[in-house]
Regions:
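Active-site core of glycosidic bond-cleaving carbohydrate-active enzymes
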Residues: 1-201
Length: 201
C-alpha cells in the first residue's frame, strides 16, 4: 500500500525489518522508502537494457525521491530522520547509509551525513555484520579506506578475539562476553554462523 505521498505504508501488525536497530517506525520509514526508490531506478535501467520504455519507473523514482527529501531530510540535523510522523526526528545510520549507497543524497548532503552520522559516535552503532557491510561500502565510496580497515579489524576481529570461528548474526562490542550468545529473549538464541555476517571475507 502507498500513501498520498507515494510512500509504502504497512498494516497495523506488519513487521518492517531493515536491521536489528532501534528505529522510529511510526508511519512511513525512511530507509524502507529509499529501498523502494532504488527499486524504481533499477527497473528503469532494466527496461533500458531490454530496449523498453522505462519512463514510468523513472517518473516514480523522481516523485518518490522528491518526497523523501521533503519529508525526511532534516537540515538542522544534517541527516535523514527515520520518521516524520512521530515528531521525534530520530536519526539512525541506516537511512543515511542508503541515501549515499543509492545516490539519493547529493554530494553536499553526503558530506553532511559523513560528519553528522557516520563519524558521529552519538549516533548508535550498527550491531549486525549484515548492515555493517553497507556502512563499509559507503565509507569506501567516500575514500575512508583506513577507517574501513580499522572497522574490519575491530568489529569482525572482535568476534574472533572472543573465540568465534564463524561470524555471528549480531555482535555488539559493548555487551559482556558471557551475554554475546543471547538474542530473541533466549540466552543462546543468536545464530553463531550467519551467511550475511561474512561480508568482508
Amino acid at each position: 500500500r502507498r500513501d498520498e505521498h507515494g510512500f509504502l505504508i504497512g498494516k497495523e501488525k506488519d513487521w518492517v525489518y531493515i536491521d536489528w536497530a532501534d528505529m522510529d517506525k511510526d508511519g512511513p520509514l525512511c530507509a524502507e522508502q529509499m529501498l523502494y526508490a532504488a527499486c524504481f531506478r533499477v527497473m528503469a535501467e532494466i527496461s533500458k537494457q531490454l530496449g523498453k520504455d522505462g519512463n514510468v519507473y523513472r517518473q516514480e523514482y523522481e516523485k518518490l525521491t522528491a518526497a523523501i527529501e521533503k519529508f525526511f531530510w532534516d537540515e538542522e540535523k544534517g541527516a535523514y530522520i527515520d520518521s516524520f510522523t512521530s515528531g521525534k526526528r530520530n536519526v539512525t545510520r541506516h537511512a543515511n547509509i542508503f541515501a549515499i549507497l543509492f545516490d539519493i543524497a547529493d554530494k553536499q548532503k553526503q558530506e553532511k551525513i559523513l560528519t553528522n552520522v557516520l563519524e558521529n559516535d552519538e549516533i548508535p552503532a550498527i550491531t549486525t555484520p549484515y548492515f555493517n557491510f553497507f556502512e563499509l561500502d559507503v565509507l569506501c565510496q567516500m575514500g575512508k579506506l583506513t577507517e574501513v580497515l580499522d572497522k574490519i579489524r575491530s568489529y569482525w576481529g572482535g568476534m574472533l578475539d572472543l573465540g568465534a570461528v564463524t561470524f555471528w548474526e549480531e555482535y555488539d562490542p559493548s555487551v559482556p562476553k558471557e551475554e554475546q550468545s543471547a538474542m530473541y529473549g533466549d540466552p543462546s538464541g543468536k545464530t553463531g554462523c550467519h551467511a550475511s555476517a561474512a561480508s568482508p571475507v
